[in-house]
């Protein structure tokens, strides 16, 4: 997602959710998090639950990316607090529009 957003937004890429949590615990507060569903060390739904159950981070909007077109999964993640669910591959312009709607 970073290659599509770099010109319009400051973007920090972190390799896995554990590094993201460490980065957040260092005091970094992003306007938005984009997270894949399938990641090393911790799945995206676990990361989402961790974030939404943490008082410091629960207000940060999270957009989930997935290559699986599963209505059940999409509804579950939205119910668990995801701001949006975007199917991969995605149109870069659509991603920018959705992000703009969330953070503006």
What are these regions (language model features)?
Residues 1-12:
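Two-component/phosphorelay signaling modules centered on CheY-like receiver
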Residues 13-32:
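Acidic, metal-coordinating helix/loop segments flanking the phosphotransfer/catalytic sites
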Residues 39:
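Receiver (REC) domain active-site loop signature in two-component systems and cognate sites
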Residues 68-69:
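Short, conserved "switch-loop" micro-motifs in signal-transduction and mechanochemical regulators
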Residues 90-99:
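C-terminal output helix
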């Amino acid at each position: 997602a970073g290659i599509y957003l770099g010109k319009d937004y400051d973007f920090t890429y972190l390799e896995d959710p554990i590094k993201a949590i460490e980065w957040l615990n260092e005091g970094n507060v992003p306007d938005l998090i984009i997270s894949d569903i399938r990641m090393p060390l911790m799945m995206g739904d676990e990361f989402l639950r961790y974030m939404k159950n943490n008082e410091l981070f629960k207000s940060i909007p999270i957009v989930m990316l997935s290559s699986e077109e599963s209505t059940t999964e999409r509804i579950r993640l939205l119910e668990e607090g995801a701001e949006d669910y975007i199917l991969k591959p995605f149109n870069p312009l659509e991603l920018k529009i959705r992000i703009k709607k969330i953070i503006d």
